[in-house]
């Protein structure tokens, strides 16, 4: 008897209030790294009706106009009208940054004879994941959820659906049979809109222009449930509808619930923070394991102690899909990937102003040129070391 189950993931658009906060935090991080790549940054953002609060800890030699960066980011997202609840021109922006604690800095900055022995910026555990459900080696539900809100933003920007506004949420439920995606069961899409669009016209346009062009044809079987703006009205949205905070969409940012999460958010954090850099490294490791043909699913856990460079643990789980044992793969990971914090920074070239682009539509599964953690350049080496044939997804 087939093992049949449903699995659901969600995403949110760049105009969702929590994503507005994430993008402001990462825009500030990028501006700082542009001038001083060794800065220590933990930039948190709160946004509400007509108000942005910037707080956190920053130690840098950079001279940054934080208020202007916040306004520019809000403008780029599309909040350029007071009717939307926040307007880049008129919103208040409060700045309250401190410097990084010297107690933390002494552990992070300390170096030994090996200059890669920079300590971790905090304790914690991080996960990376990859699977062969999509060419990008991502779980299908989160991948489709991202593409839906990405298309919503594209049609809003190009004016094809001029009544769209920046805030939107998507949710995709996929039916799995024997562990593989079989069909799409339900799609939910809620989009902010102008007050004069009638609900039937909105629903038809969203289904025909946003949802159907995004779904893979081979997974459209039978009657899919389309739930578009199921409350009936979504005029008030963005930071006016809900207070936005940095770091509140950590499952959207990663694997949509298909893999565990260590709990640490990404946006606004420089790469000395292993919450971010080690999660990126975990994705890099997992993706190369799957691309190498060592397994069709791979979950990586790494953990750290503050001020200590070497991970306190490295774990690999391939859920029974491995062509060699998990113990062998773990050994290969330790041999071929430097998972010390500074080793990760060097391996993935993370001291670059690349982070604002990560802050909407997923940190993983998008093969942008800046996203070094999406490369599969270690796959051939891993396959050769394990004695298996790599998959075709090696780049």
Curated annotation (Swiss-Prot):
One protein family per Pfam: S-AdoMet_synt_M
Cellular component terms per the entry's GO annotation: cytoplasm
PROSITE patterns, sorted: ADOMET_SYNTHASE_1, ADOMET_SYNTHASE_2
Cofactor names: Mg(2+); K(+)
GO molecular function: ATP binding; magnesium ion binding; methionine adenosyltransferase activity
Reactions this protein catalyses: L-methionine + ATP + H2O = S-adenosyl-L-methionine + phosphate + diphosphate
Binding residue positions for K(+): 44
Stretch list, region Flexible loop: 100-110
Alphabetical keyword list: ATP-binding, Cytoplasm, Magnesium, Metal-binding, Nucleotide-binding, One-carbon metabolism, Potassium, Transferase
EC number, as in UniProt: 2.5.1.6
Cofactor binding notes: Binds 2 divalent ions per subunit. Binds 1 potassium ion per subunit.
Residues noted as binding L-methionine in the record, renumbered to the chain: 57, 100, 242, 273
Biological processes, Gene Ontology terms: one-carbon metabolic process; S-adenosylmethionine biosynthetic process
Binding site for Mg(2+): 18
Top EC class, one word: transferase
InterPro entries, alphabetized: ADOMET_SYNTHASE_CS, S-AdoMet_synt_C, S-AdoMet_synt_central, S-AdoMet_synt_N, S-AdoMet_synthetase, S-AdoMet_synthetase_sfam
Pathway membership, UniProt: Amino-acid biosynthesis; S-adenosyl-L-methionine biosynthesis; S-adenosyl-L-methionine from L-methionine: step 1/1
Compartment(s): Cytoplasm
Record: residues binding ATP: 16, 167-169, 233-234, 242, 248-249, 265, 269
Cited Gene3D superfamilies: 3.30.300.10
Entry similarity comment: Belongs to the AdoMet synthase family.
Function: Catalyzes the formation of S-adenosylmethionine (AdoMet) from methionine and ATP. The overall synthetic reaction is composed of two sequential steps, AdoMet formation and the subsequent tripolyphosphate hydrolysis which occurs prior to release of AdoMet from the enzyme.
HAMAP family the UniProt entry points to: S_AdoMet_synth1
Cross-referenced PANTHER family: S-ADENOSYLMETHIONINE SYNTHETASE (PTHR11964)
Subunit structure: Homotetramer; dimer of dimers.
Protein's name in the database: S-adenosylmethionine synthase
The organism of origin for this protein: Burkholderia ambifaria (strain MC40-6)
Gene name of the record: metK
């Amino acid at each position: 008897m087939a093992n049949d189950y449903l699995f659901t993931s969600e995403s949110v658009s760049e105009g969702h209030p929590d994503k507005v906060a994430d993008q402001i935090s990462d825009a500030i991080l990028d501006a700082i790294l542009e001038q001083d790549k060794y800065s220590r940054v933990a930039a948190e953002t709160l946004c509400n009706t007509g108000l942005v609060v910037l707080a956190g800890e920053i130690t840098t030699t950079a001279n940054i106009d934080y208020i202007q960066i916040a306004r520019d980011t809000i403008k780029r997202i599309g909040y350029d009208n007071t009717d939307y609840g926040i307007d880049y021109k008129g919103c208040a922006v409060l700045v309250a940054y401190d410097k990084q604690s010297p107690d933390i800095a002494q552990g992070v900055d300390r170096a030994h004879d090996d200059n890669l022995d920079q300590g971790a910026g905090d304790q914690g555990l991080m996960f990376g994941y990859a699977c062969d459900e999509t060419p990008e080696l991502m779980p299908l539900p989160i991948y489709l959820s991202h593409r839906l809100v990405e298309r919503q933003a594209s049609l809003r920007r190009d004016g094809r659906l001029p009544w769209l506004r920046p805030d939107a949420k998507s949710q995709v439920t996929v039916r799995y049979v024997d562990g593989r995606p079989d069909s799409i069961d339900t799609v939910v899409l809620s989009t902010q809109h102008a007050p004069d669009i009638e609900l039937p016209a909105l629903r038809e346009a969203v289904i025909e222009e946003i949802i159907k062009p995004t779904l893979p044809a081979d997974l459209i079987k039978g009657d899919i449930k389309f739930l578009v703006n199921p409350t009936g009205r979504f005029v008030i949205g963005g930071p006016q509808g809900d207070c936005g905070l940095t770091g509140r969409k950590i499952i959207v940012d990663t694997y949509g619930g298909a893999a565990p999460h260590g709990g640490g958010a990404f946006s606004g954090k420089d790469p000395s923070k292993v919450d971010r850099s080690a999660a990126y490294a975990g994705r890099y490791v997992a993706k190369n394991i799957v691309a190498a043909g060592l397994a069709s699913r791979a979950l990586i856990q790494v953990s750290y102690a503050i001020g200590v460079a070497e991970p306190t643990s490295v774990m690999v789980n391939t859920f029974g899909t491995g062509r060699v044992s998990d113990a062998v793969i773990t050994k290969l990971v330790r041999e071929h990937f430097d998972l010390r914090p500074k080793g990760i920074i060097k391996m993935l070239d993370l001291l670059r102003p690349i982070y604002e682009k990560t802050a909407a539509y997923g940190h993983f599964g998008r093969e942008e040129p800046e996203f070094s953690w999406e490369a599969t350049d270690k796959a051939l080496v891993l396959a050769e070391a394990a004695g298996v044939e790599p998959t075709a997804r090696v780049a």
